[in-house]
Structure formats: structure tokens, C-alpha cells
A protein has these predicted regions:
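Conserved long hydrophobic alpha-helices within structured protein cores
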Residues: 6, 97-103
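Short amphipathic alpha-helical segments that mediate assembly, nucleic-acid/protein binding
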Residues: 6-10, 19-21
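Short, T/G/N/S-enriched strand-turn elements that build extracellular solenoid repeat scaffolds
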Residues: 15-28, 37, 41-51, 64-71, ...
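Parallel beta-helix/beta-solenoid
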Residues: 55-57
Length: 141
């Protein structure tokens, strides 16, 4: 089995999210990468695969527009600001947690086809929320 190279993973995440490597920490005991205090530019389709490859935890980040319709490992957001749309839809699958964050525009979960086992969205400030036609087994809002 190939040994995990955390430095290469940090470089890969930094490149795909277009952020500085020093903003990323690897938390070994939980096998996640914590991304701190940065602005995430728009995530283009080719680079969204970063969410499939790594467990990511965003802390105090600004995120412009994020549409998730793929299978992810796990995503956590705490004290983040979503400047535009945050949408979960269609073929989304995985674990997601969003806490103590601000959504300046749209937040939506629609047409999720697979049974999603955990979506945790709590203690946030929303402007516009739409949730309909989903298969979510454990949803905390």
C-alpha cells in the first residue's frame, strides 16, 4: 500500500482551491485538512474533485459560489461566509456540516437522488432558503 504524502496532498489542495499552502493544516487524528482564514476563489468544475479526494474543514473562510452535485468525502464549514449561492443537488452524496456561518444569498438543497445520511446545518444566518424533493435520512437544521 502506498504511503500517504500529506505535503503532496496539501500542495494538491492549495493548487485546486487556489489558496496558499500555509493556510492548510493536516489534522492527523481525524484525517482531515483544515483550511483557515482565506478567500476561496470560484471553484471550477475540474477542481471540484478536491472534495472527492480529501476530508476538508473550512474555518473562517469566504466562499463565493459553491454547487455540490457529486459524491464527496466530508465537508465541514465553521464561521464561514458564503457570498453567493450554496447549492446541494442531484447526485450529491456524502457528509456535510455547516455551523455558525452566514449565507449572503441563496442556500438550497434540491433533487438529491441518493439517500444522504447526514447533513448538519445549524446556528447559521440565512437570507433565502429552498429545500425540496430530497432523500435525506438525517437532517439537522
Amino acid at each position: 500500500m502506498e504511503e500517504f504524502d500529506k505535503e503532496q496532498a496539501i500542495a494538491d489542495i492549495a493548487e485546486k482551491l487556489n489558496i496558499q499552502k500555509d493556510k492548510i493544516l493536516y489534522i492527523e487524528y481525524s484525517d482531515l485538512f483544515q483550511i483557515n482564514d482565506c478567500v476561496i476563489p470560484a471553484v471550477i468544475a475540474d477542481n471540484i474533485k478536491v472534495f472527492q479526494e480529501y476530508n476538508l474543514y473550512f474555518y473562517r473562510c469566504t466562499i463565493p459560489n459553491l454547487i455540490l452535485e457529486i459524491t464527496i468525502k466530508s465537508l465541514e464549514f465553521k464561521m464561514c461566509c458564503f457570498e453567493s449561492s450554496f447549492i446541494i443537488r442531484n447526485n450529491f452524496d456524502g457528509y456535510i456540516s455547516i455551523q455558525d456561518s452566514i449565507f449572503e444569498k441563496d442556500f438550497g438543497i434540491f433533487w438529491v437522488k441518493k439517500e444522504v445520511y447526514k447533513i448538519n446545518v445549524c446556528k447559521n444566518i440565512f437570507k433565502d432558503v429552498s429545500i425540496f424533493e430530497n432523500k435525506i435520512l438525517n437532517f439537522n437544521f
